[in-house]
From Swiss-Prot:
The gene is sdhD. The keyword Transferase does not apply. One of its GO terms (biological process) is cytochrome complex assembly. Its main location: membrane. This is Succinate dehydrogenase hydrophobic membrane anchor subunit. The heme is bound between the two transmembrane subunits. It comes from Escherichia coli O157:H7. Coiled coil: none annotated.
Amino acid sequence: MVSNASALGRNGVHDFILVRATAIVLTLYIIYMVGFFATSGELTYEVWIGFCASAFTKVFTLLALFSILIHAWIGMWQVLTDYVKPLALRLMLQLVIVVALVVYVIYGFVVVWGV
């Protein structure tokens, strides 16, 4: 068993629950978006801006972004821990992934609240 402080959850069960919870959030978000596209009729710029400007859509989008961050981090941590044995390389890859995920969420936050 690897005991490393870079895991997101406290233990494997906690990570398991986080991954399942974020998967549910992402599934609900996909259903929400597909439902919008299926029921919106003609999709114009005004319709799209109106949809993106609603508070519910903004909050749900941010929740989905944070869910992607958590889901991806736990998954990548598990893959890197299992398959990349040199510690320096694994830590460097983890750092790159964390920075990319944080930049992704910050950029998403700016885009969502910029509408």
